[in-house]
Structures are given as C-alpha cells and as structure tokens.
Amino acid sequence: MNWNPHPIAIAGLAMLSLPMIAEAKIYLSIEQAQKILLPNKQLNKMPMIITDDLQEKMRVASSIRHPFQGDRIWKTNDGSWFIVDEVVGKHEMITYAVGLSSSGNITGIEILEYVESYGYEVAEAQWRKQFVGKNANDPIKLNQDIQNIGGATLSCKHISDGVKRVVVLYELALKHPLVQSKK
C-alpha cells in the first residue's frame, strides 16, 4: 500500500516545519560606537582574563549566565572605559557597548547588533538614555530604575542585567587594577 498525500498537505507540513528566521540588524560597528560614546578620545585595548571567581561575582550581581569575554575592553587616557558585551535576548544574542566615565558612571550605551524578530525598540535612544549616570551602586533592574518596553520585555531585562554586569566588572576589576610590583 502506497501513501499518496495531497500536495496541499505536503505544502502545509513544509510551512509548519520552517523555522522562524530572525533578521540580523547591525546598527553600529565597534569603531562607530566608540566615536559616539567616547568622542575625540584615543582608546587603548585592555584585554583581561576573567577569572572564574570574577565571572561568578558578575553572574551573582547580574543573573547573566553567558560568560563575559574579556577581550573587548578599551580604556582612554583620561580613565574612561569602552566595553562590548553580549546577552541573550529572547532566543538570540544582542551585542551592545557601554561607555563608562573614569569614576564608573555610565556615559551611554549603544546597541551594536540585534538578531531577534521582536524587541528592536531597545535600540531607541529614549530607552537607552535611562542608563546614563548609573553605576554599580544602582539597581539597574527592569521595572525598578529601568523602564520596560512592551513587546521587548526579555530584551530589556537582559540588556539591563548585562549593563549591571559591566558596571560590576568596573567596580571589581577595572576601578583599581592589580599592579604588579617590580622587584
């Protein structure tokens, strides 16, 4: 006995099995974000090894489980910082950059790449400016000191948590970097 399905049934099954395709939106390159967040400043790349202990402290403070990559950190001659990080939105990664003053206050954030189908409103300046002036002493929590965007709740939450992770990194490791004494 041969099974001979109707062509419409085959087309319907094929349509159901297609994955939802998210369109990647690249807003800025790292270099463009550097010029926006720290204009007219020379940046020096300052990669660092993120120890398991530091990674754990950052995770506890932010609830972000995705490991922080220590190879995307820059410092200016005046002590300001430019840090690139990424967090999971709903399903896909969101890459963003944070500018920090020499005292650890956020000077701005920029969304570099957004791959989710929904929630792209997190790239709007009105939402991002909520972070300016905050530091590791602030909650940086959705629905506390950061407002939500309807339809972008997970992206808002995860970016907020990620920004908290960046300011905690500053507080724990960049504010007073270990200096090896010369013998």
Predicted segments, located by residue:
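N-terminal signal peptide c-region/cleavage motif recognized by signal peptidases
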Residues: S17-P19
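Cleavable N-terminal signal peptides
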Residues: A11-G12, A22
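Flexible, solvent-exposed loop/hinge segments and secondary-structure transition points
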Residues: A22-I146, T153-K157, D161-K183
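Bacterial N-terminal signal peptides that target proteins for export
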Residues: M1-A9
